[in-house]
Amino acid sequence: MDFVGKRFWFFIISLLVITPGIIFLILAPGLNPGIDFTGGSSMTLRFSNESNINQEQVRDQLFALSYEEATVQNLGENSFFVRTRELDEVAKDALVTNITSSLDEGAENVLQGFDLVSPIVAQETVMNAFWAIIAAAIGIFIYIWWAFRNVPSPLRYGLAAIVALIHDTIIVIGIFAILGELMNMEVNTMFLIALLTVIGYSVNDTIVVFDKIRENVLIHSNRAFPEIVNLSISETISRSLNTSFTLLITLVALILFGGATIREFLFVLLIGVAAGAYSSVAIASQVLVSWDQKSIGIPFRNRTVT
């Protein structure tokens, strides 16, 4: 298959996937921040087995108590994870008492866990996450630049990997902006952990292809660079797709049968793994070819490779 000759269409597909997310980020409320970023309280409530309480009942009770901003997640087995504004001890005890008396009177030890995140801590979390992502990107760039020092223009390998990384990150953030609007998904600490995991996975996929390109550059020094890239993609695509497909199946199973508390983490991984598998073939490698042909800004200037 002529992967290199179709790079313009790969760029168009990426643009079509990224654009809706950008629109939601700009025109809609954007990302839906959790209490890890805004500050607030979270609690886990567990009612008696005989109560048969559902998520709507808990949400309605919170609304009746003037906690309209609260969100509720069903953890199964009559357990619920509640996020709301910042509560002091008095407000927390009053809230739990009112919910218990209304939904499961007489139940004991309903409150299973309580966490408080102040706005200052939330702000520090945002900044720490930002610097962690920047540090990861710089580290990845330096490593790839050094690892590919034996091939011509090793700098472009590092920059191409960063382009793919940015591509995958934008896709994840954009889709999460849409999911936040449609499914009330929050951006929290688990989101950031998953995003850093996606960055590592994306780079791993890219390095597999780049390493094969490096090997073929040394073996087939008499062949044009686009031909070498095409050959390298053909030799690695089966491995990349099989690995990604296996991981995607596992993630789908966890989303369907796993707990709600790691829902955001799993969705980020699901989106990121798919984006990473695509970008290693359709973005990172094609940026290398476009750079080699000095046609990064001229995507229509394709070269068919057989």
PLM features: what roles do these ranges have?
Residues 1-306:
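A structural signal for conserved, well-ordered secondary-structure elements
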